[in-house]
């Protein structure tokens, strides 16, 4: 998984192999085992219980759902304990395991101090006051 993916998309990838419920914008419901889900929410489900808008229920073997037609998905509660949330908690608490250099004040830690203020006092600096 890429670092640029948002949490909902990562959670969707974690839901592969679990039973999910997908409601489409048209009002139709699909409940089945998620085989695969793409970043754009395109999903493959198998062993589906399909509920039409009028309430009629039928069984389907295999379905591919276009992501732009999805209103929302219901995923299992067990995914609350997914490893990605543990990494997220660590990052929030300041115990980040990221490899990059931070962008805050501590980013220049260990570098020689440049003195107070900006710059080194070269050309364009304010001259000292003579007395």
From Swiss-Prot:
Q: What does this protein do?
A: Core component of the spliceosomal U1, U2, U4 and U5 small nuclear ribonucleoproteins (snRNPs), the building blocks of the spliceosome. May play a major role in the splicing of cellular pre-mRNAs. Required for normal plant development.
* Domain Sm, chain residue ranges per copy: 7-79
- Cite the PANTHER family for this sequence: SMALL NUCLEAR RIBONUCLEOPROTEIN SM
Molecular function terms from GO: RNA binding
Recorded family membership:
Belongs to the snRNP core protein family.
Q: Which SUPFAM superfamilies match?
A: Sm-like ribonucleoproteins
Q: How is loss of this gene reflected in the phenotype of the organism?
A: Pleiotropic phenotypes of delayed flowering time and seed production, reduced root growth, partially defective leaf venation, abnormal numbers of trichome branches and changed numbers of floral organs. The double mutants smd3-a and smd3-b display embryonic lethality.
First-listed, main subcellular location of the protein, grouped into a coarse class: cytoplasm
Tissues in which the UniProt entry reports expression: Expressed in young seedlings, roots, leaves, flowers and immature siliques.
Keywords, comma-separated and alphabetical? Cytoplasm, mRNA processing, mRNA splicing, Nucleus, Ribonucleoprotein, RNA-binding, Spliceosome
Protein name per its UniProtKB record: Small nuclear ribonucleoprotein SmD3b
**What biological-process terms (Gene Ontology) are attached?**
developmental growth; mRNA splicing, via spliceosome; spliceosomal snRNP assembly
Region described as Disordered: 96-131
């Amino acid at each position: 998984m890429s670092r640029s993916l948002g949490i909902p998309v990562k959670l969707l990838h974690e839901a592969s192999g679990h039973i999910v419920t997908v409601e489409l914008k048209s009002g139709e419901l699909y409940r089945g085992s998620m085989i695969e889900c793409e970043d754009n929410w395109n999903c493959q489900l198998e062993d589906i219980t399909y509920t039409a808008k009028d309430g009629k229920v039928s069984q389907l073997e295999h379905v591919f759902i276009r992501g732009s037609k999805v209103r929302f998905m219901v995923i299992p509660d067990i995914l609350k304990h997914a490893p990605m949330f543990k990494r997220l908690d660590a990052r929030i608490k300041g115990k980040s395991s990221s490899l990059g250099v931070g962008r805050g004040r501590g980013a220049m830690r260990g570098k020689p101090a440049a003195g107070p203020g900006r710059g080194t006092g070269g050309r364009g600096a304010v001259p000292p006051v003579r007395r």
